[in-house]
Amino acid sequence: MQGDRLIFELILNIALLVLIANLISKFRLIQKLILQEDRSLKSQAFLSVVFGGMVVLSTYTGIDIGSYSLNTRVIGAMAAGLLGGPIVGLYASLIGAIYVYLFSAHQAFAMASAFSTMMFGLLGGGFYPYFQRGKWKYQDLFLLTCFAEVCDMVCLLRFTVPVEMALNTILEISLPMILLNASGILIFISSFNHMFIQQDIERSRQ
């Protein structure tokens, strides 16, 4: 029953992020900034704050399970890089990393969580050329997110003392967190697809 409750709460947190994604994707300002190929520093800063806020929200709504917090940080951080590019991914994840490091309820995991949050944003930014303009394949995005979450588990083992604490936590949370977050980012990213479709339609008419 405890495991079912954790999974249900994680699904609710993912649903919250998807709801936010659906809402902000309707704003013309957000559409314009994401569709821009050459963004100004001001535009990148704005997107960094938007996606960084989602990473902070994911930390704040994390589900406590003993010494760790089951969370959805990977969704906002990776989406920042995939949709906004390397700079947006870097600074959005930096905002999230600073927050989790300073305000994490579980200081034993603070360094590992901050490091992995940065990694999520950089990983998304690194794959930005491949995923941009809505041309991504969902199975590739799913596997990329699974890889990111596995790296997160490695960070827990690397930076957490004692190691036994990290290992016990990983055994408890790894499978649901990996699979649900990987599925969640597919729905999150798909919320922005209509922008790219509309842009392609407009270009075909020109």
Language model features with spans:
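Membrane-helix interface segments
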Residues: 86-91, 134-138
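Generic transmembrane alpha-helix motif of multi-pass integral membrane proteins
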Residues: 73-89, 123
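Residue-level recognition of pore/gate-forming positions within transmembrane alpha-helices
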Residues: 55, 96-97, 117, 149
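Interfacial segments of multi-pass membrane proteins
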Residues: 84-85, 99-104
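Hydrophobic alpha-helical segments embedded in the membrane of multi-pass proteins
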Residues: 53, 70-78, 94
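Loop-to-helix transition at the N-terminal end of transmembrane alpha-helices
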Residues: 37-52
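Membrane-embedded alpha-helical hairpins and interfacial helices in multi-pass inner-membrane proteins
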Residues: 1-26, 48, 62-72, 104-206
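Membrane-interface helix-loop junction between the first two transmembrane segments
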Residues: 23-38
